[in-house]
Amino acid sequence: MTDRANSRDKGRQAEEMACAHLLRQGLATLGKNWTCRRGELDLVMLDGDTVVFVEVRSRRHRAWGGALESIDARKRQRLILSAELFLQQEARWAKRPCRFDVVTVDTSDGQSPPRLDWIQNAFDA
């Protein structure tokens, strides 16, 4: 398996762990890996009446910084644009309040299971 395929598989595993964690917290899934010309939304969830756009970040090594630090201004802008397109295409959710959350999956210390942190309202649109 190539490094890129291995990385993609690990990313999908992190997204599945994050989704399962959020479901246990009472959120409902509206979409997974929703793609558009602007990018991809890892998870789209519903928390009460709030539409939640969730970015999942995984890190195996801290040498490049933590998972949260990897979401720079450019990535945030792509997430916001993707969320706007989601709401245009899925009009039934357009009038609901929205927020952007981040779930970090940390496997840097070899813990089993990995450490998950759910950061609500991680950034503003």
Curated annotation (Swiss-Prot):
Molecular function per GO: nucleic acid binding
Record family assignment: Belongs to the UPF0102 family.
The protein, known as: UPF0102 protein PSPA7_4996
Entries under InterPro entries matching the protein: Restrct_endonuc-II-like, tRNA_endonuc-like_dom_sf, UPF0102_YraN-like
Superkingdom of origin: Bacteria
